[in-house]
Amino acid sequence: MAFFSRKPKGPFIKTSEMTMHWDTEDPFIFVSHHEDDYPHGNAQMAPPLQEISGRNLGRDYKKTFGFRMYNGKVVPGFPMHAHWGYETITLPQTGYVDHSDCEGNTGRFGFGDVQWVSAPGFYEHCEMYPLVDQEGRNPNDITQIMIALPLEKKNLPESSVNTVWKEEMPYFETEGCRVQVICGEYNGKSVWSPSTHTWADKSHSVRILRVELDPSGKFEVGPADPKVNRNLYFVSGDKARIMGFEVIWNLHMKIDPGATVDIENGSEKSVFWLLEGEPIGQKMSMFGPILLGTDQEVRDALQTIRLEEFKRWPWDVIDRVNPIDSGRFLLRSDGTRETPPE
């Protein structure tokens, strides 16, 4: 909660406290932030049995012993599920994600890598959190961002999966400040979605920054295109002075795009996310994993998923993980293997 009066002031249009699922604006449709302190893994890369017994396995969203299993029943994470009509960006700052999909792609990424999945049409994948450390703990810090696709790009057959390795990511660093440029431009650094079907390109002024500030560190970004929706998230830390106002962490701020965002951090290390982009501005219908143009299209898509979800899945299990010693890689269905640069 900020130290504001009842109404936000100055460049702040709206403020709200944050939860695991963040408030978003067009073109962003959903953001989830998962932080879990998993224990050492067993031979299955799963938590010890005594720490998962008694849970509502398959839908465990309550932290017990410091972690959640989510939809996983053995390994934490999200077994086979559909995406339809949007693009997903996943950044595990700590921890690993094992990814397998309906097209036969599989891989492991983590510790600063960024995965882009564009799913204009019916697409299925699983995202599991393997506990690869069998002696120490396996903490996870995973942020997932979903960006809508415009109506003209929905229901196209070409989905895509790409991993941008941590070693290839653009960073901007000054004393006390480290900015990871996930999408867009910042101080001469730039990167855009590698997907064919995307809204996250230069022409739509999409920018996604992850900002780490040391105690007393400073960050600044100038005014944006007046058309964009601009949102700042104070994810961890204690206090900071943002555009002249003192706020405390766990705060979402919708900000006037014409303002310069300047942050002076307090006495603890802090993490902020900045999400901005030109809104698509089209009426859409969403239910569960589907974002299409009309309610009827969504109903038809749900029926397709019910009839086809297991027929399209090429793997033996719906919660697939890779071997414990796999390292970070992306193995495409055509046999092409991609790994981080040496």
State what each model feature region is.
Residues 1-342:
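Jelly-roll (double-stranded beta-helix
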